[in-house]
């Protein structure tokens, strides 16, 4: 079987996927080591028996709903190729909105940034890449996530980031930052979307929070003040229906300049506030 015929068959088998053609192409690129342009130009290239078996196994797993990123171990975020694993969330395009808003608020001078619950390191590494003059600290409570974020930093040769194991602020006593960012768990445990799509395979501890999904958001907002320098910013990603509640917690905790920004789909996604003692 050649590239072209396998793609045709795979697209048909993945017809219930949101993106059957792209899914099939990614799997073929991953197994053959060939880029999309090569595959399109040389569709008559035969697959080896080993490649056909690998593709059959991956195709079956994808048909059962396993995310492409977990099948290949790779995901692009902010144009950075990242290693991913089932120990962490898969970086999503909407989270790039958090990076955009953070960059827009960073001062021109060198500053210190903290990323809470870093997972793959996506947010921290994007900020560190864009602002090599800044010192970025990234923390996660899960050892596997810390190891993965370190691997990504080393692979990308990003030097201005340090990655630590910490449950939110627990290992950061006495330290201060000019900006704190986070994409914490914010989904309610009873949300029916937890049984749909990619999230079925992602770690629930990185998705679900108590108090209707607000517990971790509230904890960060209430405790970030003591870690921020005067005038420093806190930016949080949250659910599309949580904007009003998150703004209320920011204001209750004494932050100024509180505002919510929308994601690429037009939904309220990132809320920020400024620490003004």
Curated annotation (Swiss-Prot):
Name the CDD domains for this protein.
AdoMet_MTases
Name the Gene Ontology biological process terms.
Answer: methylation; translational termination
What EC class does the entry list?
A: transferase
Q: Which residues bind substrate?
A: 183-186
* Cysteine disulfide links: none
Please list the residues that bind S-adenosyl-L-methionine.
Answer: 117-121, 140, 168, 183
The question of whether Disulfide bond is a record keyword is answered with no
Q: Which UniProt keywords apply?
A: Methyltransferase, S-adenosyl-L-methionine, Transferase
Catalytic activities: L-glutaminyl-[peptide chain release factor] + S-adenosyl-L-methionine = N(5)-methyl-L-glutaminyl-[peptide chain release factor] + S-adenosyl-L-homocysteine + H(+)
The Swiss-Prot or TrEMBL record describes its family as follows: Belongs to the protein N5-glutamine methyltransferase family. PrmC subfamily.
What the entry lists under PANTHER family is as follows: HEMK METHYLTRANSFERASE, MTRF1L RELEASE FACTOR GLUTAMINE METHYLTRANSFERASE
Xref: HAMAP family: RF_methyltr_PrmC
Its name, as the record gives it, is: Release factor glutamine methyltransferase
Say which species the protein is native to: Salmonella typhimurium (strain LT2 / SGSC1412 / ATCC 700720)
Q: What is the primary gene name for this protein?
A: prmC
